[in-house]
Swiss-Prot record:
Pathway where this protein functions: Amino-acid degradation; L-histidine degradation into L-glutamate; N-formimidoyl-L-glutamate from L-histidine: step 1/3
Name of this protein: Histidine ammonia-lyase
Reaction catalysis annotation: L-histidine = trans-urocanate + NH4(+)
Similarity section: Belongs to the PAL/histidase family.
Natural source organism: Rhodospirillum centenum (strain ATCC 51521 / SW)
Entry GO CC: cytoplasm
Length: 509
Protein backbone atom coordinates (compact mmCIF):
# COMPACT_ATOMS: atom_id res chain seq x y z
CA UNK A 1 0.00 0.00 0.00
CA UNK A 2 1.36 3.43 -0.97
CA UNK A 3 2.09 5.63 2.03
CA UNK A 4 0.81 9.20 2.24
CA UNK A 5 3.32 11.95 2.94
CA UNK A 6 1.86 15.26 4.07
CA UNK A 7 4.15 18.03 2.84
CA UNK A 8 4.32 21.31 4.71
CA UNK A 9 6.75 24.21 4.25
CA UNK A 10 10.13 23.34 5.84
CA UNK A 11 8.60 20.19 7.32
CA UNK A 12 10.66 17.34 5.84
CA UNK A 13 12.42 15.11 8.36
CA UNK A 14 15.13 12.52 7.86
CA UNK A 15 12.50 9.85 8.47
CA UNK A 16 10.38 11.34 5.66
CA UNK A 17 13.34 11.32 3.31
CA UNK A 18 14.03 7.66 4.07
CA UNK A 19 10.38 6.85 3.33
CA UNK A 20 10.56 8.54 -0.06
CA UNK A 21 13.68 6.59 -0.95
CA UNK A 22 12.14 3.33 0.26
CA UNK A 23 9.18 3.28 -2.12
CA UNK A 24 6.24 5.08 -3.74
CA UNK A 25 4.46 7.78 -1.76
CA UNK A 26 1.31 9.80 -2.29
CA UNK A 27 1.94 13.48 -1.65
CA UNK A 28 -0.69 15.50 0.14
CA UNK A 29 -0.54 19.31 0.23
CA UNK A 30 -3.15 21.36 2.06
CA UNK A 31 -4.50 24.38 0.12
CA UNK A 32 -3.32 26.75 2.86
CA UNK A 33 0.24 25.49 2.38
CA UNK A 34 0.17 26.80 -1.19
CA UNK A 35 -0.74 30.35 -0.15
CA UNK A 36 2.86 31.52 0.26
CA UNK A 37 3.76 30.18 -3.18
CA UNK A 38 0.79 31.95 -4.76
CA UNK A 39 1.80 35.20 -3.04
CA UNK A 40 5.29 34.97 -4.51
CA UNK A 41 3.85 34.33 -7.98
CA UNK A 42 1.70 37.47 -7.62
CA UNK A 43 4.82 39.45 -6.70
CA UNK A 44 6.47 38.32 -9.94
CA UNK A 45 3.39 39.39 -11.91
CA UNK A 46 3.46 42.79 -10.22
CA UNK A 47 7.11 43.28 -11.17
CA UNK A 48 6.33 42.56 -14.80
CA UNK A 49 3.40 44.95 -14.70
CA UNK A 50 5.60 47.71 -13.28
CA UNK A 51 8.04 47.49 -16.17
CA UNK A 52 11.06 46.78 -13.96
CA UNK A 53 13.91 44.71 -15.33
CA UNK A 54 14.70 41.82 -12.99
CA UNK A 55 17.13 38.98 -13.64
CA UNK A 56 15.49 35.66 -14.41
CA UNK A 57 12.06 37.18 -14.95
CA UNK A 58 12.48 39.33 -18.04
CA UNK A 59 16.16 38.91 -18.87
CA UNK A 60 18.43 36.29 -20.36
CA UNK A 61 20.51 34.01 -18.17
CA UNK A 62 24.14 33.71 -17.13
CA UNK A 63 26.34 35.85 -19.37
CA UNK A 64 23.17 36.88 -21.25
CA UNK A 65 21.63 38.44 -18.14
CA UNK A 66 21.87 41.96 -19.61
CA UNK A 67 19.51 41.07 -22.46
CA UNK A 68 15.98 42.30 -21.72
CA UNK A 69 13.10 40.11 -22.92
CA UNK A 70 9.81 41.72 -23.94
CA UNK A 71 6.60 40.72 -22.10
CA UNK A 72 5.08 38.89 -25.08
CA UNK A 73 8.09 36.55 -25.18
CA UNK A 74 8.33 35.64 -21.50
CA UNK A 75 6.50 32.31 -21.82
CA UNK A 76 8.81 31.32 -24.69
CA UNK A 77 11.79 32.39 -22.57
CA UNK A 78 10.89 29.92 -19.82
CA UNK A 79 10.15 27.12 -22.29
CA UNK A 80 13.43 27.72 -24.12
CA UNK A 81 15.28 27.63 -20.82
CA UNK A 82 13.98 24.16 -19.99
CA UNK A 83 14.61 22.83 -23.51
CA UNK A 84 18.15 24.18 -23.82
CA UNK A 85 19.18 23.12 -20.33
CA UNK A 86 17.93 19.53 -20.72
CA UNK A 87 21.39 18.60 -21.95
CA UNK A 88 22.35 15.76 -19.61
CA UNK A 89 23.97 12.52 -20.63
CA UNK A 90 24.73 9.07 -19.28
CA UNK A 91 22.60 6.42 -17.64
CA UNK A 92 19.33 7.40 -16.00
CA UNK A 93 19.29 8.11 -12.29
CA UNK A 94 17.62 5.43 -10.15
CA UNK A 95 13.86 5.84 -9.81
CA UNK A 96 14.08 6.28 -6.04
CA UNK A 97 16.49 9.18 -6.47
CA UNK A 98 14.24 10.87 -9.04
CA UNK A 99 11.26 10.42 -6.73
CA UNK A 100 13.20 12.18 -3.99
CA UNK A 101 14.30 14.94 -6.39
CA UNK A 102 10.65 15.69 -7.14
CA UNK A 103 9.73 15.74 -3.46
CA UNK A 104 12.64 18.04 -2.64
CA UNK A 105 11.70 20.43 -5.44
CA UNK A 106 8.09 20.54 -4.25
CA UNK A 107 9.27 21.15 -0.68
CA UNK A 108 11.49 24.03 -1.79
CA UNK A 109 8.77 25.69 -3.87
CA UNK A 110 6.27 25.36 -1.01
CA UNK A 111 8.35 27.74 1.05
CA UNK A 112 6.96 30.55 -1.11
CA UNK A 113 10.09 32.39 -2.19
CA UNK A 114 10.37 31.12 -5.77
CA UNK A 115 7.53 32.79 -7.67
CA UNK A 116 5.96 29.51 -8.80
CA UNK A 117 2.19 29.07 -8.94
CA UNK A 118 0.40 26.41 -6.93
CA UNK A 119 -0.75 24.78 -10.18
CA UNK A 120 2.83 23.92 -11.06
CA UNK A 121 3.61 22.65 -7.56
CA UNK A 122 0.51 20.44 -7.61
CA UNK A 123 1.57 19.05 -10.99
CA UNK A 124 4.96 18.00 -9.63
CA UNK A 125 3.26 16.41 -6.63
CA UNK A 126 0.88 14.54 -8.96
CA UNK A 127 3.85 12.99 -10.78
CA UNK A 128 5.13 11.70 -7.45
CA UNK A 129 1.76 10.32 -6.41
CA UNK A 130 1.30 8.56 -9.76
CA UNK A 131 4.88 7.21 -9.60
CA UNK A 132 5.39 8.77 -13.04
CA UNK A 133 9.07 9.53 -12.64
CA UNK A 134 10.93 11.57 -15.26
CA UNK A 135 13.92 9.98 -16.96
CA UNK A 136 16.90 12.01 -15.72
CA UNK A 137 20.40 11.42 -17.12
CA UNK A 138 22.91 11.14 -14.29
CA UNK A 139 25.69 13.27 -15.77
CA UNK A 140 25.83 16.93 -16.66
CA UNK A 141 25.79 19.00 -13.47
CA UNK A 142 28.69 20.77 -11.78
CA UNK A 143 26.61 21.80 -8.77
CA UNK A 144 26.37 25.53 -9.59
CA UNK A 145 24.32 27.33 -10.84
CA UNK A 146 22.33 24.59 -9.21
CA UNK A 147 21.75 21.20 -10.81
CA UNK A 148 20.57 22.75 -14.06
CA UNK A 149 20.67 19.85 -16.50
CA UNK A 150 19.23 17.17 -14.19
CA UNK A 151 16.45 19.47 -13.02
CA UNK A 152 15.63 20.47 -16.60
CA UNK A 153 15.12 16.79 -17.40
CA UNK A 154 13.08 16.46 -14.21
CA UNK A 155 10.54 19.11 -15.30
CA UNK A 156 10.61 18.43 -19.04
CA UNK A 157 7.55 16.12 -18.79
CA UNK A 158 5.49 19.03 -17.44
CA UNK A 159 5.79 20.48 -20.95
CA UNK A 160 4.74 17.16 -22.47
CA UNK A 161 8.31 16.37 -23.51
CA UNK A 162 10.91 13.80 -22.57
CA UNK A 163 10.26 10.40 -21.04
CA UNK A 164 9.07 9.01 -17.72
CA UNK A 165 9.35 5.74 -15.86
CA UNK A 166 5.90 4.28 -15.28
CA UNK A 167 5.19 0.84 -13.83
CA UNK A 168 8.73 -0.28 -14.58
CA UNK A 169 8.67 0.88 -18.21
CA UNK A 170 10.09 3.92 -19.97
CA UNK A 171 7.26 5.71 -21.78
CA UNK A 172 6.67 9.09 -23.47
CA UNK A 173 5.94 12.01 -21.17
CA UNK A 174 2.37 12.17 -22.45
CA UNK A 175 1.68 8.75 -20.93
CA UNK A 176 3.10 9.85 -17.60
CA UNK A 177 1.00 13.01 -17.60
CA UNK A 178 -2.11 11.00 -18.38
CA UNK A 179 -1.38 8.61 -15.50
CA UNK A 180 -1.08 11.61 -13.19
CA UNK A 181 -4.24 13.25 -14.54
CA UNK A 182 -2.29 16.14 -16.05
CA UNK A 183 -1.97 18.03 -19.31
CA UNK A 184 1.13 19.88 -20.56
CA UNK A 185 1.67 23.20 -18.80
CA UNK A 186 2.71 26.60 -20.07
CA UNK A 187 5.21 27.99 -17.61
CA UNK A 188 4.76 31.50 -16.32
CA UNK A 189 7.46 34.15 -15.78
CA UNK A 190 10.40 32.88 -13.68
CA UNK A 191 8.86 29.43 -13.27
CA UNK A 192 11.26 27.66 -15.60
CA UNK A 193 14.24 29.19 -13.83
CA UNK A 194 12.86 28.35 -10.39
CA UNK A 195 12.31 24.74 -11.43
CA UNK A 196 15.80 24.35 -12.91
CA UNK A 197 17.79 26.28 -10.33
CA UNK A 198 18.46 24.47 -7.07
CA UNK A 199 20.40 21.67 -5.41
CA UNK A 200 17.70 19.01 -5.46
CA UNK A 201 19.56 16.54 -7.71
CA UNK A 202 22.79 16.55 -5.72
CA UNK A 203 20.88 16.54 -2.43
CA UNK A 204 18.73 13.56 -3.46
CA UNK A 205 21.80 11.62 -4.59
CA UNK A 206 23.64 12.48 -1.38
CA UNK A 207 20.69 11.40 0.76
CA UNK A 208 20.46 8.10 -1.11
CA UNK A 209 24.17 7.63 -0.49
CA UNK A 210 23.77 8.54 3.18
CA UNK A 211 21.05 5.94 3.74
CA UNK A 212 23.12 3.29 1.95
CA UNK A 213 26.17 4.29 4.00
CA UNK A 214 24.23 3.89 7.24
CA UNK A 215 23.28 0.35 6.22
CA UNK A 216 26.90 -0.43 5.37
CA UNK A 217 28.06 1.04 8.69
CA UNK A 218 25.59 -1.03 10.70
CA UNK A 219 26.36 -4.28 8.88
CA UNK A 220 30.10 -3.65 9.26
CA UNK A 221 29.68 -3.12 12.99
CA UNK A 222 27.83 -6.44 13.30
CA UNK A 223 30.36 -8.26 11.13
CA UNK A 224 33.16 -6.70 13.16
CA UNK A 225 31.65 -8.01 16.39
CA UNK A 226 31.38 -11.49 14.87
CA UNK A 227 35.02 -11.26 13.79
CA UNK A 228 36.06 -10.48 17.36
CA UNK A 229 34.60 -13.76 18.59
CA UNK A 230 35.74 -15.69 15.53
CA UNK A 231 39.34 -14.63 16.22
CA UNK A 232 38.92 -14.96 20.01
CA UNK A 233 39.51 -11.27 20.45
CA UNK A 234 39.03 -9.29 23.63
CA UNK A 235 36.10 -7.09 24.55
CA UNK A 236 38.21 -5.06 26.98
CA UNK A 237 38.93 -2.33 24.39
CA UNK A 238 35.20 -1.55 24.35
CA UNK A 239 35.02 -0.72 28.06
CA UNK A 240 32.96 2.46 28.45
CA UNK A 241 35.58 4.05 30.71
CA UNK A 242 38.15 4.10 27.91
CA UNK A 243 35.86 5.94 25.51
CA UNK A 244 34.49 8.35 28.08
CA UNK A 245 38.01 9.69 28.59
CA UNK A 246 38.26 10.65 24.94
CA UNK A 247 34.77 12.10 24.78
CA UNK A 248 34.15 11.61 21.07
CA UNK A 249 30.43 10.96 20.73
CA UNK A 250 30.56 8.61 17.76
CA UNK A 251 33.29 6.54 19.39
CA UNK A 252 31.30 6.27 22.63
CA UNK A 253 28.19 5.16 20.75
CA UNK A 254 30.07 2.66 18.57
CA UNK A 255 31.76 1.11 21.60
CA UNK A 256 28.36 0.74 23.26
CA UNK A 257 27.15 -1.02 20.13
CA UNK A 258 29.97 -3.55 20.31
CA UNK A 259 29.30 -4.16 24.00
CA UNK A 260 25.63 -4.86 23.32
CA UNK A 261 26.46 -7.27 20.51
CA UNK A 262 29.13 -9.18 22.45
CA UNK A 263 27.46 -9.29 25.87
CA UNK A 264 27.22 -12.79 27.31
CA UNK A 265 29.36 -14.50 24.67
CA UNK A 266 30.54 -17.97 25.83
CA UNK A 267 33.38 -17.75 23.31
CA UNK A 268 34.70 -14.67 25.10
CA UNK A 269 34.30 -16.33 28.50
CA UNK A 270 36.33 -19.32 27.30
CA UNK A 271 39.58 -17.39 26.81
CA UNK A 272 39.55 -14.71 29.50
CA UNK A 273 42.87 -15.94 30.88
CA UNK A 274 44.67 -16.44 27.55
CA UNK A 275 48.22 -15.13 27.05
CA UNK A 276 47.39 -12.72 24.22
CA UNK A 277 47.65 -9.18 25.56
CA UNK A 278 46.49 -7.02 22.64
CA UNK A 279 44.50 -7.60 19.47
CA UNK A 280 45.35 -6.16 16.05
CA UNK A 281 44.07 -2.66 15.40
CA UNK A 282 41.36 -3.94 13.05
CA UNK A 283 39.70 -5.50 16.11
CA UNK A 284 40.86 -3.30 18.97
CA UNK A 285 40.39 0.12 17.36
CA UNK A 286 36.95 -0.48 15.86
CA UNK A 287 35.20 2.08 18.10
CA UNK A 288 37.77 4.73 17.25
CA UNK A 289 37.53 4.19 13.48
CA UNK A 290 33.85 3.38 13.23
CA UNK A 291 32.99 6.12 15.71
CA UNK A 292 34.79 8.70 13.58
CA UNK A 293 32.87 7.42 10.55
CA UNK A 294 29.63 7.70 12.50
CA UNK A 295 30.40 11.30 13.43
CA UNK A 296 30.95 12.10 9.74
CA UNK A 297 27.69 10.43 8.73
CA UNK A 298 25.75 12.25 11.43
CA UNK A 299 27.19 15.63 10.50
CA UNK A 300 26.40 14.99 6.84
CA UNK A 301 22.87 13.91 7.78
CA UNK A 302 22.29 17.21 9.56
CA UNK A 303 23.55 19.21 6.60
CA UNK A 304 21.44 17.27 4.12
CA UNK A 305 18.29 17.40 6.25
CA UNK A 306 18.66 21.19 6.34
CA UNK A 307 19.28 21.34 2.59
CA UNK A 308 16.20 19.19 1.94
CA UNK A 309 14.04 22.02 3.29
CA UNK A 310 16.07 24.86 1.81
CA UNK A 311 15.20 27.40 -0.88
CA UNK A 312 18.06 27.18 -3.35
CA UNK A 313 16.93 28.83 -6.58
CA UNK A 314 17.75 32.33 -7.78
CA UNK A 315 16.59 35.07 -7.72
CA UNK A 316 14.49 34.81 -4.58
CA UNK A 317 11.11 36.49 -4.20
CA UNK A 318 10.17 38.18 -0.91
CA UNK A 319 6.44 38.96 -1.20
CA UNK A 320 6.18 40.80 2.12
CA UNK A 321 8.71 43.39 0.94
CA UNK A 322 8.05 43.21 -2.79
CA UNK A 323 11.75 42.50 -3.30
CA UNK A 324 13.36 40.08 -5.73
CA UNK A 325 16.98 39.49 -4.80
CA UNK A 326 19.77 37.72 -6.64
CA UNK A 327 22.09 35.62 -4.50
CA UNK A 328 23.90 32.31 -4.62
CA UNK A 329 21.89 29.70 -2.73
CA UNK A 330 22.15 27.49 -5.82
CA UNK A 331 25.84 26.88 -5.05
CA UNK A 332 25.87 23.35 -3.64
CA UNK A 333 29.08 23.55 -1.61
CA UNK A 334 27.37 22.32 1.60
CA UNK A 335 26.08 19.26 -0.27
CA UNK A 336 29.46 18.62 -1.89
CA UNK A 337 31.26 18.72 1.43
CA UNK A 338 28.64 16.51 3.09
CA UNK A 339 28.99 14.00 0.25
CA UNK A 340 32.77 14.08 0.65
CA UNK A 341 32.32 13.25 4.34
CA UNK A 342 30.10 10.29 3.48
CA UNK A 343 32.63 9.11 0.90
CA UNK A 344 35.47 9.22 3.43
CA UNK A 345 33.36 7.27 5.92
CA UNK A 346 32.45 4.63 3.32
CA UNK A 347 36.08 4.18 2.34
CA UNK A 348 37.13 3.68 5.96
CA UNK A 349 34.22 1.37 6.81
CA UNK A 350 35.22 -0.88 3.91
CA UNK A 351 38.94 -0.59 4.58
CA UNK A 352 38.61 -1.73 8.20
CA UNK A 353 36.24 -4.57 7.25
CA UNK A 354 38.67 -5.84 4.61
CA UNK A 355 41.49 -5.80 7.17
CA UNK A 356 39.43 -7.99 9.51
CA UNK A 357 38.81 -10.48 6.72
CA UNK A 358 42.54 -10.49 5.95
CA UNK A 359 43.22 -11.17 9.62
CA UNK A 360 40.69 -14.03 9.75
CA UNK A 361 42.23 -15.89 6.80
CA UNK A 362 45.79 -15.48 8.13
CA UNK A 363 46.80 -18.41 10.39
CA UNK A 364 49.46 -16.23 12.03
CA UNK A 365 46.90 -13.76 13.40
CA UNK A 366 43.48 -15.46 13.57
CA UNK A 367 43.73 -17.21 16.93
CA UNK A 368 44.29 -20.74 15.70
CA UNK A 369 41.80 -20.94 12.83
CA UNK A 370 42.87 -22.87 9.71
CA UNK A 371 44.48 -20.95 6.87
CA UNK A 372 41.86 -19.34 4.63
CA UNK A 373 39.17 -20.74 6.94
CA UNK A 374 38.97 -24.18 5.35
CA UNK A 375 40.18 -27.66 6.24
CA UNK A 376 42.43 -29.67 3.96
CA UNK A 377 44.21 -26.51 2.84
CA UNK A 378 46.14 -26.84 -0.38
CA UNK A 379 43.48 -29.03 -1.92
CA UNK A 380 41.00 -26.34 -0.85
CA UNK A 381 41.66 -22.59 -1.18
CA UNK A 382 38.72 -21.50 0.98
CA UNK A 383 38.41 -17.73 1.41
CA UNK A 384 41.69 -16.92 -0.36
CA UNK A 385 40.23 -15.11 -3.37
CA UNK A 386 37.13 -13.84 -1.57
CA UNK A 387 39.53 -11.77 0.53
CA UNK A 388 41.20 -10.55 -2.68
CA UNK A 389 37.78 -9.45 -3.94
CA UNK A 390 37.25 -7.49 -0.72
CA UNK A 391 40.68 -5.91 -1.16
CA UNK A 392 39.84 -4.90 -4.73
CA UNK A 393 36.60 -3.25 -3.63
CA UNK A 394 38.33 -1.46 -0.77
CA UNK A 395 40.94 -0.07 -3.14
CA UNK A 396 38.25 1.11 -5.57
CA UNK A 397 36.64 3.04 -2.76
CA UNK A 398 39.92 4.65 -1.78
CA UNK A 399 40.16 6.16 -5.26
CA UNK A 400 36.51 7.19 -5.30
CA UNK A 401 36.88 8.88 -1.91
CA UNK A 402 39.07 11.67 -3.28
CA UNK A 403 37.29 14.90 -2.24
CA UNK A 404 35.19 16.28 -5.08
CA UNK A 405 34.56 19.63 -3.44
CA UNK A 406 38.18 20.70 -3.94
CA UNK A 407 37.67 20.52 -7.69
CA UNK A 408 36.22 23.40 -9.68
CA UNK A 409 35.98 24.29 -13.34
CA UNK A 410 34.70 27.60 -14.77
CA UNK A 411 31.52 27.47 -16.88
CA UNK A 412 29.15 29.81 -18.73
CA UNK A 413 31.85 32.02 -20.24
CA UNK A 414 33.43 32.51 -16.80
CA UNK A 415 30.26 34.04 -15.35
CA UNK A 416 29.97 30.91 -13.22
CA UNK A 417 33.64 30.70 -12.35
CA UNK A 418 33.57 28.52 -9.23
CA UNK A 419 31.45 25.39 -8.90
CA UNK A 420 30.90 22.79 -6.19
CA UNK A 421 30.96 19.48 -8.12
CA UNK A 422 28.29 18.36 -5.65
CA UNK A 423 26.46 16.15 -8.11
CA UNK A 424 29.54 14.05 -8.83
CA UNK A 425 30.43 14.10 -5.13
CA UNK A 426 27.01 12.61 -4.38
CA UNK A 427 26.61 10.38 -7.43
CA UNK A 428 29.63 8.20 -6.62
CA UNK A 429 28.23 7.40 -3.15
CA UNK A 430 25.85 4.67 -4.30
CA UNK A 431 28.72 2.89 -6.06
CA UNK A 432 30.89 3.26 -2.98
CA UNK A 433 28.13 1.96 -0.70
CA UNK A 434 27.64 -1.01 -3.02
CA UNK A 435 31.38 -1.72 -2.84
CA UNK A 436 31.31 -1.42 0.95
CA UNK A 437 28.39 -3.84 1.14
CA UNK A 438 30.39 -6.33 -0.91
CA UNK A 439 33.37 -6.00 1.42
CA UNK A 440 31.21 -6.48 4.50
CA UNK A 441 29.45 -9.45 2.88
CA UNK A 442 32.80 -11.23 2.55
CA UNK A 443 33.65 -10.47 6.17
CA UNK A 444 30.25 -11.67 7.32
CA UNK A 445 30.82 -15.03 5.63
CA UNK A 446 34.37 -15.28 6.96
CA UNK A 447 33.35 -14.42 10.51
CA UNK A 448 30.52 -16.97 10.49
CA UNK A 449 32.95 -19.58 9.19
CA UNK A 450 35.30 -18.72 12.06
CA UNK A 451 32.47 -19.00 14.57
CA UNK A 452 31.70 -22.49 13.25
CA UNK A 453 35.28 -23.54 13.88
CA UNK A 454 34.81 -22.53 17.54
CA UNK A 455 31.93 -24.95 18.06
CA UNK A 456 30.61 -26.24 20.41
CA UNK A 457 31.20 -22.81 21.93
CA UNK A 458 28.68 -20.19 20.94
CA UNK A 459 28.80 -16.45 20.52
CA UNK A 460 26.32 -13.98 22.05
CA UNK A 461 22.57 -14.24 21.50
CA UNK A 462 22.32 -11.35 18.99
CA UNK A 463 25.33 -12.59 17.03
CA UNK A 464 24.02 -16.17 17.03
CA UNK A 465 20.84 -14.81 15.42
CA UNK A 466 22.89 -13.20 12.64
CA UNK A 467 24.93 -16.41 12.25
CA UNK A 468 21.71 -18.41 11.91
CA UNK A 469 20.39 -16.01 9.27
CA UNK A 470 23.60 -16.42 7.28
CA UNK A 471 23.50 -20.20 7.55
CA UNK A 472 19.91 -20.24 6.28
CA UNK A 473 21.26 -18.90 3.00
CA UNK A 474 24.90 -20.01 2.91
CA UNK A 475 26.23 -23.32 4.22
CA UNK A 476 29.50 -24.04 6.02
CA UNK A 477 32.53 -24.34 3.76
CA UNK A 478 33.76 -27.90 4.24
CA UNK A 479 35.28 -27.86 0.74
CA UNK A 480 35.69 -25.45 -2.17
CA UNK A 481 32.60 -24.48 -4.16
CA UNK A 482 31.46 -21.69 -6.46
CA UNK A 483 31.94 -18.70 -4.16
CA UNK A 484 30.31 -15.76 -5.96
CA UNK A 485 26.68 -16.81 -5.28
CA UNK A 486 27.45 -16.94 -1.56
CA UNK A 487 28.78 -13.38 -1.58
CA UNK A 488 25.62 -12.23 -3.36
CA UNK A 489 23.48 -14.10 -0.83
CA UNK A 490 25.30 -12.33 2.01
CA UNK A 491 24.79 -9.00 0.27
CA UNK A 492 21.10 -9.82 0.09
CA UNK A 493 21.01 -10.47 3.84
CA UNK A 494 22.60 -7.08 4.47
CA UNK A 495 20.15 -5.33 2.13
CA UNK A 496 17.21 -7.06 3.82
CA UNK A 497 18.35 -5.93 7.27
CA UNK A 498 19.00 -9.48 8.49
CA UNK A 499 22.55 -8.63 9.57
CA UNK A 500 21.55 -5.48 11.44
CA UNK A 501 22.17 -4.32 15.00
CA UNK A 502 18.73 -2.78 15.43
CA UNK A 503 20.20 0.66 16.15
CA UNK A 504 19.10 3.83 14.35
CA UNK A 505 22.54 5.40 14.12
CA UNK A 506 21.38 8.65 12.54
CA UNK A 507 18.48 9.28 14.89
CA UNK A 508 20.44 11.86 16.84
CA UNK A 509 21.90 13.59 13.76
Amino acid sequence: MTETLRLTPAGLTLADLRRVLAGPVRLEIAPRDLEAAEASARTVAEVIGSGRTVYGINTGFGLLARTRIEPDRLAQLQRNLVLSHAAGTGEAMPDRVVRLMLVLKVASLLRGFSGVRGEVIRALAALVSAEALPLVPAKGSVGASGDLAPLAHLVLPLLGLGQVRLAGRTVPAADGLAAAGLRPLELGPKEGLALLNGTQASTALALAGLVAAEWAFDAALVAGALSIDAAQGSDTPFDARIHALRGQRGQIDAAAGYRRLLAGSPIRASHLSCARVQDPYCLRCQPQVMGACLDQLRFAAGTLATEANAVTDNPLVFPDDGDILSGGNFHAEPVAMAADQIALALAEIGSLSERRTAMLVDPHHNGGLPAFLVTDGGLNSGFMIAQVTAAALASENKGLAHPASVDSIPTSANQEDHVSMATWAARRLLEMADNAAGIVAVELLAACQGIDFRRPLRTSAPLEAVHAAVREEVGFYDRDRHFAPDIEAARGLIAAGRAASGTDWLAAA
